[in-house]
């Protein structure tokens, strides 16, 4: 049950008394703390006082609760709280007063505010004294707060009215009181107060009347308060200032103004301001009370100079025309002048350079003449190449020089130079006008595309060339800035004024937004501001009838109409793509309501003619967006506009160049739009009526094709369509061309697609030579030129893209006229690069590539697109000719080289998304000659930054590397393989280029790992491939392979890698990788894991069904290297049959790979046509046979011992007699007999030996291994033919050693000596025959004739030893070990010279070395892998026999220790250890006469355990090492160490026997002789005593108790003595001494006394 009881419900009086008492104690404690705080404050220990006050306010009776209320109140507590807060406030004030000079201003203010807080809080608990009121009055004075000062003064005056009455006489007042009255009087005057408040006593009023004329001494103001007052005054001044924004303008333009103003408000999309919260200005945290603009002084001067007359700035005019043609037309020259004054793409002025800097630039000026020579060379190369295609008209430097261009004939080129010279933002916008999406979105149906095209073209028309706003804006902008800065207008006012200036109708009848070309950024700002304050603008304009104001309404209506077009277009696109469009519909509805409201307002306004037409035309444009073409209102509206415009023939044109969805307004454009609507209505009706028929649609496309290509045609609606096209504006015709190109591209009609492209390009070029172009102003011509170039680029890119996607960059029967069109465009674009050369010549010209980076990239792309098409067109025209094909091929390569050098010179050859380099790569890979390869290397660097032996650094152009795609990688790899290894086998060539190796590694890394499971054909092939290696090696397998009938039924996957694999990509990559592995292996740096990637690569080549026998051969070599590595470095994998399985399987794989390679070669060698390739393949085939024969021999001999020729039986379950099932043990059966293995080896090696054309080229190993097999299998056959083959091998080895100059080949010579010795021993050879065979190799030995005269066996053996030593003397690397062993074996066997044999064997074995090696031999280069482990085992056994012969069992014991650590250095290490242990134990037993049964087992049975423990302990205590023979101790210690190393029981007998025989028993006997009591006598253990027996040295006085022992069956006396022995507890069972007990004593004795 809870023990809680609410206090307010408790009736316990004791509890209330306890609370009261506790509260009283807290009050007392608070008083003490308060007094301490006062003392510290008085002593100015501010920090201590602060801490004390903090403690005070932590007491419950002082601090309020969380709501600021006090639970208990009393006069004492109120007084205490008042004093606490009062003095705490004074503490903060005093601290600030003393330290304000060292404090930050923020800290000073913080302390003053805390002072106010505490003092004001004190007033809540008591009446303030004079100190508090005067301090508050001073602080409020420093705050400049009259209201707070008046409050405190009135508080002071009304605090004690009686005191004021008593002190009504001024003479009776204190100075402070007079000062209060004086301040209050002055304050009332300042506030213009005539009557006092009602709470002021009348006595105060009397004093105030007197105080006005009385002089009162002013109190001194403390410095702290003066500082506070100054800060407050400064803050007040700052607050009075307007919160404005100063915008720094980088240029005098409306765009800069608009973007700067836009940056002041939060950014959002224009469509997002269509809702209720339209103006983002409301999201600002603080208002913008005024806006001001600042401009750069230098920019002002530049703008001022731009308004000067041409005569006032001759240097600008000179700069402008320095690259312009001379002309007699003054108007044109004047027009060009302002454009030259424009700066870079951002329209920023260039900084001035110092004279010293200019001089430095002049010194480093490039060789311009050399640059001109470069252009001359390039143009000559291009002309010569084009002559082959029949292009007679040359391009010349003279016509490209701007000073030589004829005005009328090459006006477009002259205009192009003008643009490059004076490029500004407006030129960038001109260039962007031609950029639009080429493809038509929507249905793939062709007729529907045509309908959509007509419908989309209704929203826009031709972009009429118009003057740029930047040409006239400087003075207007300057005036605008001046007005804003002078008047300090609010942001709203500045924004409205900005909109008004740009949207209103000017005095000259123009409107900036419709009649001048703007940048998109400026239009976006105007659109954003207009829609943001649309409601305010409507309210302002709606009651007005002023034309200027109403014109703003028309402009805003046009802006909303254009926005409606954008929304409707996005809505249509999203519907066509199946995306969500709910938000767009909502935006459209909101905007529609605004448009309707403005439309109704404008209908009621009186409009001038131009405004009326603008309003009607924008209304018509809005109808086009929002209604269907069948809407009658649409037709009525445009008919009314057309009829009205006919009444005003001088109306002119409203350009609308800034609107995407409002076309230009003129009678011509109205009629064009009307025509489009009529045509669209016709198509719509046809589409409805012929919903299921397609013929009509095709007819319209066919008619359109004939009309645009000017081909005669007839048919329904042909004339109407012809009329429509002829009257269509330029952009409409352009869209029709795009429609046709898309149509024929989708139909893959290459011929018509190609014809349409070249016809459309001619159409675009004709625009630049038209009369209309000639009569335009310079700026208009520049606009037309740049937009036309963009259109040419878009058409060319589309044409190139379709060629790549559909027809692999191939043209269909291109004509010379078509090539001439491309050459004309190229010639027009050549000023792009020629101008860069001129900039290096003339310092006043700035590089176009540097001043307009983005625009230059666009034109560079066009340049490279045209150049790429030129190359392709020239290639297909030249290759049509049958004669002089090599010359034509050279012209193609020369053209590629010239164009690449040109683009690379100016560092843009990688533009056009790398397609220019892609074209070169594609074409150059078709020509397998040195010239093509040279240029291809340069292309590879520029495109991928892959360097393949680039000799000239200038060929390494500054480009950005592109990632290589798989298709290009395969194409290039096939080319390089074909180019480098033409009609040759790569395995035969000795000089493989390392440059290609890097390339192939890059390609293989790009391709990556192949997922066989992703392709069912590869999965199938992989399964058969793996199954092949599980089959055993049988005689039938070898026969089928040798007959060429052995194969695996692979299928080609024919995927994207097939061509690359067939071309040899994976095969060549594997060859390079394997060569690298061999080189690393030779220097012992290779790792077998490196072979995994090579095996995987070769496996891929095989699985793709290439039927390349070399791949199988190399795969076998890889597995051979794996086996060699397993058998060379360590014998761990040879320790048991299970461990050898992995190596045997790899060896089996190698043999099977060789057999498959053999079969493939024999079945396909007749298909090779080239004699050179046949000879190369024959050499590879010979190497294959040698590898196969060697591998089969290696698998047959030790240490593998034919494991690869076995097969594992499947598990078998046997039913036993008791009915249970039993698994038979797994067994291995030979898959081929040993006889057949050896026959196959002999046949293969013999066949390989016959394939050598010259005798000196023969491989010495072939006859060597054949003779070796004969020697091992049949000595008779060896005598007949084997010895001759061996002598042949010695001759070849000697010849090849002298030719190569490397280490001598000694294996054959040793084999000859060894085999002759063995054959003489087994009587195969007689002495004379053996000498005769040895003399055949005297060319190597070089012995004089008399040394060959041997008459007896001993002399023959000495001759053998001399020959073996001579072989060792020729061993430079000292790796030959077999002759040493043979010498030792002959000395031991024939001469019984054990010491001499051991001396020889000590050269091979190192028992006393500190390392773990026992046998110091290594595998010679020509020795079969793994044989050195066999030989090491043989040498160890032979050495142990020699030691045993010398009875050196201690050395044998030492061998045991080393053999345990040398286990990985030979085979059968455990057998060797067991033999060494056996020899050591037997030797120790013989040497020390040890009998384990007598001195071990029987003795342990007879000794009582207590006696053994007691005596063993005494023996341990009395043991001295010098009392025993050293040989006994050495054997004892060695046996223990050997036992300790293996924990084996083999050494237990030796250790225990020595312990009892030489230590324990003599100690007991000595004990028996020295004691007066009967000592235990143990029968039959008295062995031979050492001379210094410990029994002679035991003290005589030592007593020895009699030990119980077992009765001896041999003597009766022992029985009597035993009967007299006292026995304790005879009924107990006696514990016997075990081996473990004895060995514990042995361990203790050795480790404590001997170690």
Curated annotation (Swiss-Prot):
Q: Which residues form a coiled coil?
A: none
The answer to whether keyword Transcription regulation applies is yes
Q: Cross-referenced InterPro entries, in alphabetical order?
A: Hir3/CABIN1 (IPR033053)
The Gene Ontology CC terms held by the record are: HIR complex; nucleus
Where do the TPR repeats start and stop?
Answer: 30-63
Q: Where is this region: Disordered?
A: 1-22, 333-368, 1575-1632
Please provide the record's keywords in A-Z order: Chromosome partition, Nucleus, Repeat, TPR repeat, Transcription, Transcription regulation
Coarsely, its chief localization is nucleus
Chain intervals with Low complexity compositional bias: 1589-1609
The protein's location, in the record's own words, is: Nucleus
Q: Where is the sequence biased in composition, kind Polar residues? A: 1-13
| BP terms from Gene Ontology | chromatin organization; chromosome segregation
GO terms assigned for molecular function: nucleosome binding
* Biased amino acid composition, Basic and acidic residues: 333-365
Q: Give the family from UniProt.
A: Belongs to the HIR3 family.
Briefly state the protein's biological role. Answer: Has a role in a nucleosome assembly pathway that is required for the integrity of heterochromatin and proper chromosome segregation.
> What is the protein name given in its UniProt record?
Histone transcription regulator 3 homolog
What organism does this protein naturally occur in? Kluyveromyces lactis (strain ATCC 8585 / CBS 2359 / DSM 70799 / NBRC 1267 / NRRL Y-1140 / WM37) (Yeast)
Q: What is the lineage of its organism?
A: Eukaryota, Fungi, Dikarya, Ascomycota, Saccharomycotina
What would be the name of the gene that encodes this protein?
Answer: HIR3
